Amino acid sequence: MIRVEIYERLEAAAVAEVLELVEAGARADGLSALNEQTILNLRHGGAEAEPGAHLMIRDAEGTLVGYANLELDNDGVAAVEMLVHPTHRHNGHGEALLAALIKRATAAKCRALTIWAHGDHPTALLLADRHDFTRDRVLWQMRRHLTDADGDGEPAAGITIRSFVPGRDETRLLEVNNAAFADHPDQGGWTVRDIAMREREDWFDPEGLLLAERDVDGQVLGFHWTKVHGSGDSAIGEIYVLGVAPEAQGLKLGAALTTAGLRYLRGRGLDTVMLYVDESNVRAVRLYTGAGFTRWTTDVNYHKKL
């Protein structure tokens, strides 16, 4: 019988074990089984603000071979991510984790359970079907090569694009982010703490966080947060977050910020850029496809009523 251990909080040593497990999975699968926010919460203690649980499976030697993260929101929905070590798959560990997650969420009187399958792995689909989950949301990673012709968008008169200044621009960035993504399930509702956690990450570079500022009053109307994954020849750039304040729609700031960000990434010596977009966002998919992006990987969010 597979034993699933459940913890409200993880000590530093256990967090290190989870991150090692994530790295092992990423080496085998080419992508992380946990999203960025989950990893940030693990590293910086964000789970203290998110009620939920950590579920762990160990082998006979005590080595961590399975992990699941469960977070509860204020609407009674339990969000889950899980992974099993590549050498321990197809042995019932995923089944055991998911059964324990459903039991935990039901006991917490959640009305629904959602789970991300990063990479849309066939095993995830089998588990989802077996437990009556349905596909609820599909996220594409799209990529393209950077070229000299990376867009011709320029800011309108009276608007300057400049780099973020740590310690000065956090509040303004937060305001425009939450206005631009008011209805977005992941990006909306940020706090200063969400920005601070990212500022502490090794990848953070204020030069690559570009703000569109109105000259007359310094109002930030939009931003393009770029990100660089990896190093050396394997490094790849990302259009991490691109947001424009509702009142600035129609000024073509999106095009101007995109161009500025791609130029910045190319200046870093990168030749490939990626981004994430919802499959259901037909307008954005059409825009990115027209800009030369093609689908690279697919993440699927499965949903189950409890």
UniProtKB/Swiss-Prot annotation:
GO terms for biological process: mycothiol biosynthetic process. The keyword Transferase applies. Signal peptide: none annotated. Acetyl-CoA 2 binds at residues 242-244, 281-286. InterPro entries: Acyl_CoA_acyltransferase, Bact_Acetyltransf, GNAT_dom, Mycothiol_AcTrfase. Belongs to the acetyltransferase family. MshD subfamily. This is Mycothiol acetyltransferase. The gene is mshD.
